[in-house]
């Protein structure tokens, strides 16, 4: 790396638009709909799946955030990208895409999956959710899987699209305690490792100020 560049770090910052219309980059680097929660804490962002994902906040050091997720709980809005794959041949397509057997994943369950090139090189990984017998979401890490789905879907009865879903993660040993407090009904029981469930959450908008929203 150039010695001059090695003295700098590069980041993306949120700046007021001062009444000007958004620039083109505002549409190619969309922010999480709940990013307003982070704005009071001078966030720094990176580009992840062409989405903005927070890397740093002024209220916590890297070490403090690490120990929070190890010993307590954090709430984080990510750039992970869910893609929906549905239709009679959805399972067939996904078994062509991923190295682990999708047939074993039952509705209401998730599975860690990763996609590889034909020579074995890894494209990306993520969590596959089986929402129904013929409907899946793949919440992927950074990488281009959409084109790979399309390339392998020829001749199959399957639909591949972006459901316009954003991922927020509740992480840490106290994550289930927090979830029990925010969902409207009782936490699904049993709620096992890699289970998925559809629950409703009440959000209360109490103030026009981003600092005071709850």
Over which residues does each language-model region extend?
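Short, conserved secondary-structure transition motifs
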Residues: 161-178, 182
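Glycine-centered loop/turn motifs
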Residues: 106-110, 145-146, 189-199
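Acidic, proline/glycine-enriched N-terminal capping motif
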Residues: 2-116, 121
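Single conserved hydrophobic/aromatic residue that forms the stacking wall/gate
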Residues: 205-214
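Helix N-cap motif at beta-to-alpha junctions
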Residues: 88, 141-146, 173-175
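Internal alpha/beta scaffold segment
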Residues: 136, 141-162, 187
